[in-house]
């Protein structure tokens, strides 16, 4: 995640939060909507497309790849995104028959935890960066945004349903 390189410099948050924390919950929302409407096979395809797009953007716009941390950020970001998103798709699919908010919330929370742990441990373990503190700040924002994303999920799910799904959303 390119945005993880930029700490939030407001309200003394630069030690505990990067802008990367705000982008992944949106990715989970998109995947969950696709999963609800089209099923897990299409949702997985969207994850793979997002992974390839992220890889291309990282190669084109990343900072300094001669820097070991930049390489670790790229590897950590790609690995975390792919594993967390695929897990999100699987968990969502298993919980899809529950009340409407259970699948997107639980899958996003599990995916966010996995994404955060994998990314920060791969990108920053052993580098001297205070990655544990950053990861907690990142995870707290992801949890908050996952809760907020239930609002657009609920609103958008009606649009998704109108496209042609016949199954009622609880």
Indicate where each model-derived feature is located:
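Cytoplasmic-side transmembrane-helix entry/capping segments in multi-pass membrane proteins
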Residues: 41-52, 99-105
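Juxtamembrane helix-loop boundaries in multi-pass membrane proteins
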Residues: 17-18, 47-48, 108
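Structural signal for membrane-spanning alpha-helices in multi-pass inner-membrane proteins
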Residues: 1-5, 57-65, 119, 123, ...
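Interfacial aromatic-anchored transmembrane helix boundaries in multi-pass membrane proteins
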Residues: 5, 16-17, 55-78
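Membrane-embedded alpha-helical hairpins and interfacial helices in multi-pass inner-membrane proteins
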Residues: 71-169
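Long, contiguous secondary-structure blocks with strong helical propensity
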Residues: 30-33, 37, 45, 52, ...
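Membrane-helix exit/interface motif
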Residues: 30-34, 59-67, 86-91
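Hydrophobic transmembrane alpha-helices
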Residues: 1-38
């Amino acid at each position: 995640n390119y945005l993880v390189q930029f700490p939030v410099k407001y309200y003394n948050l630069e030690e505990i939060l990067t802008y990367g924390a705000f982008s992944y919950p949106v990715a989970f929302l998109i995947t969950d909507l696709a999963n609800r409407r089209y099923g897990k096979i299409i949702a997985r395809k969207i994850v793979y497309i997002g992974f390839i797009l992220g890889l291309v953007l990282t190669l084109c716009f990343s900072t300094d790849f001669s820097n070991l941390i930049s390489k670790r950020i790229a590897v950590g970001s790609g690995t975390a995104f792919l594993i967390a998103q695929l897990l999100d798709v699987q968990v969502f699919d298993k919980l899809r028959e529950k009340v409407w908010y259970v699948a997107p919330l639980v899958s996003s929370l599990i995916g966010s935890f996995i994404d955060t742990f994998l990314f920060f441990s791969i990108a920053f373990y052993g580098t001297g960066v205070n990655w544990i503190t950053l990861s907690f700040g990142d995870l707290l924002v992801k949890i908050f945004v996952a809760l907020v994303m239930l609002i657009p999920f609920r609103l958008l799910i009606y649009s998704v349903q109108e496209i042609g799904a016949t199954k009622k959303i609880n």
